């Protein structure tokens, strides 16, 4: 199975066997996908490239997709920070085009499943939090993924923490993502750097330390 972590700007690729052991090299790709069709095309190209590396194997797809996903129909309902607002029938379109089995789910759900299958601690209840350009989470309760109504559970990134804060991509103000996601932290770092003397010599590794010492 070719496992892909898909966002509007990148795809992470890893082939794995039925025991979830990695096969071949991990790959990180930056992509330019201005439309749903362009995103599907990038996924197809990635699959064809790996298919050539394993010509004697059936390479199915497992897609971890950011945003709200219907795992039954395989539809990406919303993908935050994507330049489109329409749902994408990912599973149907890729299965028709490639002639393989395609599994689609939310990226945080996939992280929780991996933790459940790979962790030997036998914990029955836990939460996985994914901090990227957004913030998401997934809950495992009594060893089962908690999905909630309309598969919208775990959207903690859109919990309002500052009603007077900056506008979020979801249209509301002061969501957690606007202050604690990687994209928000990068923006805050750029603003802080501009307030420093011109001759300040800083690199990303020392930035956190310098900011902490200031306080």
Where are the regions a protein language model picked out?
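A mobile "lid/hinge" subdomain adjacent to the ATP/sugar-phosphate binding pocket shared
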Residues: 65, 176-214
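Hydrophobic beta-strand positions
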Residues: 15, 68-69, 139, 160
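Glycine-rich phosphate-binding loop and adjoining helix at the ATP-binding site
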Residues: 25-125
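Gly/Thr-rich phosphate-binding beta-strand-loop-beta motif of the actin/hexokinase/Hsp70
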Residues: 1-24, 128-140
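Short, surface-exposed charged micro-motifs
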Residues: 3-5, 101, 158
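Hydrophobic "anchor" residues
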Residues: 22, 76, 145-146
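Glycine-rich phosphate-binding loop of actin/hexokinase-like ATP-binding domains
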Residues: 122-179
């Amino acid at each position: 199975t070719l496992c892909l972590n898909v966002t509007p700007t990148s795809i992470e690729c890893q082939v794995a066997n039925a025991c979830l052991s990695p096969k071949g090299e991990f790959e990180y790709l930056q992509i330019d996908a201005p439309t749903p069709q362009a995103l599907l095309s990038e996924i197809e190209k990635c699959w064809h490239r790996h298919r050539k590396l394993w010509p004697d194997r059936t390479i199915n797809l497992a897609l971890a997709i950011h945003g709200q996903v219907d795992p039954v129909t395989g539809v990406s309902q919303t993908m935050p920070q994507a330049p489109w607002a329409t749902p994408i029938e990912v599973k149907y379109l890729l299965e028709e085009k490639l002639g393989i089995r395609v599994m689609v789910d939310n990226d945080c759900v996939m992280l929780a499943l991996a933790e459940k299958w790979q962790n030997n601690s036998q914990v029955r209840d836990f939460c996985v939090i994914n901090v990227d350009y957004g913030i998401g989470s997934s809950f495992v309760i009594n060893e089962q993924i908690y999905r909630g109504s309309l598969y919208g559970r775990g959207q903690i990134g859109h919990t309002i923490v500052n009603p007077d804060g900056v506008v979020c991509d979801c249209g509301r103000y002061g969501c957690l993502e606007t202050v604690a996601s990687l994209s928000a932290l990068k923006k805050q770092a750029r603003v802080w750097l501009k307030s420093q003397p011109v001759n300040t010599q800083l690199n990303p590794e020392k930035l956190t330390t310098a900011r902490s010492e200031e306080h």
